[in-house]
Amino acid sequence: MTATRTIGIDPGTARMGWGVVEETDGVLRLVDCGVLTTSAELSQAERLLLLYNELRHLIEQYHPAAAAIEELFFGKNVNTALTVGQARGVVLLTLAQAGIPVYEYKPLQVKQALAGYGGADKRQMQEMVRLTLRLPAIPRPDDAADAVAVAICHTYAAPMIRRIEEGR
């Protein structure tokens, strides 16, 4: 009866969602989730440093065995894509320094894993997070629910990933 923890990350500079999901014998449980926030009054470098330090604290507190993060989606707003990319780089660096393997998933993969349908909207995804983890309410805020969703996606994919890695 081994418990495995996965931290899911929804990267962002102003708001970074995170969620820790634990799997024991096929049963998933939400350990904790939340959002790291930074003030717009800080410089970009100060915001990234704050995210780095806060993420390190979460890793020390929850001891995840793996991390899951959505692949970066390039929308029309180039500035948003750049700042999210910077936050994502901080996340990848922090996890690599801690020796935590990182698994990346496309938004479509996360939707298919949780809802069984790649066209699921945000509300449907949040409800599937609630149902999957048998929660009384949807995790809030939305950024935290998104992070929990990607952690669940990885938890579902992990057994197959292990088989593939063992076969190499």
Swiss-Prot record:
Pfam families: RuvC. One of its GO terms (biological process) is DNA repair. GO terms for cellular component: cytoplasm; Holliday junction resolvase complex. It comes from the Bacteria. This is Crossover junction endodeoxyribonuclease RuvC. The active site is at D10, E70, D143. It catalyses: Endonucleolytic cleavage at a junction such as a reciprocal single-stranded crossover between two homologous DNA duplexes (Holliday junction). Its cofactor is Mg(2+). Keywords: Cytoplasm, DNA damage, DNA recombination, DNA repair, DNA-binding, Endonuclease, Hydrolase, Magnesium, Metal-binding, Nuclease. Belongs to the RuvC family. The keyword Cell division does not apply. Binds 2 Mg(2+) ion per subunit. It is found in: Cytoplasm. Its EC number is 3.1.21.10. HAMAP family: RuvC. InterPro entries: RNaseH-like_sf, RNaseH_sf, X-over_junc_endoDNase_Mg_BS, X-over_junc_endoDNase_RuvC. Gene3D superfamilies: Ribonuclease H-like superfamily/Ribonuclease H (3.30.420.10). Mg(2+) 2 binds at E70. The RuvA-RuvB-RuvC complex processes Holliday junction (HJ) DNA during genetic recombination and DNA repair. Endonuclease that resolves HJ intermediates. Cleaves cruciform DNA by making single-stranded nicks across the HJ at symmetrical positions within the homologous arms, yielding a 5'-phosphate and a 3'-hydroxyl group; requires a central core of homology in the junction. The consensus cleavage sequence is 5'-(A/T)TT(C/G)-3'. Cleavage occurs on the 3'-side of the TT dinucleotide at the point of strand exchange. Mg(2+) 1 binds at D10, D143. Homodimer which binds Holliday junction (HJ) DNA. The HJ becomes 2-fold symmetrical on binding to RuvC with unstacked arms; it has a different conformation from HJ DNA in complex with RuvA. In the full resolvosome a probable DNA-RuvA(4)-RuvB(12)-RuvC(2) complex forms which resolves the HJ. One of its GO terms (molecular function) is magnesium ion binding.
